[in-house]
């Protein structure tokens, strides 16, 4: 299917860390299945940029985020976005935490160290966040964070003191 399509980017979201699959995702989907899809897309079309996204604030640990990014990168994914999960309604999963912007900046750095060609990491980032700028970065342009973004990829934020996460209590 991908062989004949004039795509530049194939995007498929892993959504959450593997441990939370059964809580967050539809039972027909999984982190492992998403990895296979992303790997397969890259095998069929090595020229195709691949992108995925992770939501945070669902109960994962910082270490699990780093591990998930490493797993995604290992299958050849080129671009990644990380953003805060926001509970759409009371019927949806509650928010577990709101990581401080400094933690998003740390994840941005980890993703770059892992070799992602483009990264957007921040509380307001969504899976298609500034897709054009992310594409330009992946093609060798300026990192998204140097474009004057507000609240998006926040690796430019330097926080005095230690980074913390605010735990959220839901009624």
PLM feature segments, named:
Residues 2, 14:
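RNA-contacting regions in translation and RNA-metabolism proteins
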Residues 4-6, 29-49, 54-171:
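Auxiliary Fe-S-binding modules of radical SAM enzymes
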Residues 6-11, 19:
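Structural/interface elements that position substrates and couple domains in central-metabolism enzymes
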Residues 15-17, 85:
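Short, acidic/turn-prone active-site loops that include or flank metal/cofactor-
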Residues 18-22, 60-63:
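Short acidic/glycine-rich loop or secondary-structure boundary segments that cap or lie
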Residues 19-32:
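Glycine/Thr-rich beta-alpha phosphate-binding loop at enzyme active sites
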């Amino acid at each position: 299917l991908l062989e004949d399509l004039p795509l530049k980017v194939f995007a498929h979201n892993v959504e959450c860390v593997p441990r939370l699959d059964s809580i967050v995702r539809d039972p027909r989907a999984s982190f492992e299945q998403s990895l296979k899809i992303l790997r397969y897309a890259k095998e069929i079309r090595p020229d195709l940029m691949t992108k995925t996204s992770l939501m945070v604030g669902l109960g994962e640990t910082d270490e699990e985020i780093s591990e998930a990014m490493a797993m995604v990168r290992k299958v050849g994914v080129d671009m990644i976005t990380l953003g805060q999960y926001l509970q759409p309604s009371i019927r949806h999963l509650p928010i577990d935490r709101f990581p401080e912007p400094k933690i998003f900046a740390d994840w941005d750095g980890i993703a770059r160290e892992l070799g992602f060609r483009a990264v957007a990491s921040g509380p307001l980032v969504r899976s298609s966040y500034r897709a054009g700028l992310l594409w330009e970065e992946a093609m060798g342009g300026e990192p998204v964070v140097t474009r004057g973004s507000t609240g998006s990829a926040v690796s430019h934020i330097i926080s005095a003191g230690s980074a913390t996460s605010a735990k959220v209590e839901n009624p």
